[in-house]
């Protein structure tokens, strides 16, 4: 790196001399560029020094380094209070207590798995921070609760669609096949311009909304696009929405 910079400097010295003789105010024009080149050279020198230091310190295998040495080398600070002796905290359990723990583990896993399933969303709810970033002229009279209610209906539809698409031919009911045929027709109209099969159109969501929210659906779309909850693709007279 150093030889490369030096060679460039030597080649440009003659050009600088010619420019100084023929161009007025050349020094004031070229001085910022020269300072930038000097800063780049300093950065390259620092990088070369760090590389050499890394090669010198890591000639041996990493198995020879202790955890503290590795943290010091990487610049990781470990507080003394966070270091805990695990062996000292291990307490021998009796057979009765271990049996109770084993019987309670399945129940705890069952309880913890339910919220995880409910938390899985294709279109997540809008947070307060995201709602505040939406311009007021787009929101109008829309509130966070109204927006999240519309988002929840979108998520319900896409979750239902995802489940139907994940079924095998034997698992599909007659109504499922009719819905699939309609979706395939829409995919043909989209002309393969959609990046996903999980999409919806306005007529899919409007019937799911309450009467007071149906007029607000069109106003909610620009707001949801602003916070990147959904994207849209116009194909002829239809507008497709997808997360």
From Swiss-Prot:
Keywords: Cell cycle, Cell division, Centromere, Chromosome, Cytoplasm, Cytoskeleton, Kinetochore, Microtubule, Mitosis. Pfam families: SKA1 (PF07160). GO terms for cellular component: cytoplasm; kinetochore; meiotic spindle; microtubule; mitotic spindle; outer kinetochore; spindle microtubule. The keyword Cell division applies. One of its GO terms (molecular function) is microtubule binding. Residues 119-243 are annotated as: Microtubule binding. It is found in: Cytoplasm, Cytoskeleton, Spindle; Chromosome, Centromere, Kinetochore. Residues 95-116 are annotated as: Disordered. Residues 95-112 have a biased composition (Polar residues). It comes from the Eukaryota. GO terms for biological process: attachment of mitotic spindle microtubules to kinetochore; cell division; chromosome segregation; mitotic cell cycle; mitotic metaphase chromosome alignment; regulation of attachment of spindle microtubules to kinetochore; regulation of microtubule polymerization or depolymerization. Component of the SKA complex, a microtubule plus end-binding complex of the outer kinetochore that stabilizes spindle microtubule-kinetochore attachments, promotes alignment of chromosomes at the mitotic spindle equator (chromosome congression) and assists suppression of the spindle assembly checkpoint. Kinetochores, consisting of a centromere-associated inner segment and a microtubule-contacting outer segment, play a crucial role in chromosome segregation by mediating the physical connection between centromeric DNA and spindle microtubules. Component of the SKA complex, composed of two copies of ska-1 and a single copy of ska-3. The core complex associates with microtubules and may form dimeric assemblies. Interacts with ska-3 and microtubules. Belongs to the SKA1 family. PANTHER family: SPINDLE AND KINETOCHORE-ASSOCIATED PROTEIN 1 (PTHR28573:SF1). This is SKA complex subunit 1. The lineage of its organism: Eukaryota, Metazoa, Ecdysozoa, Nematoda, Chromadorea.
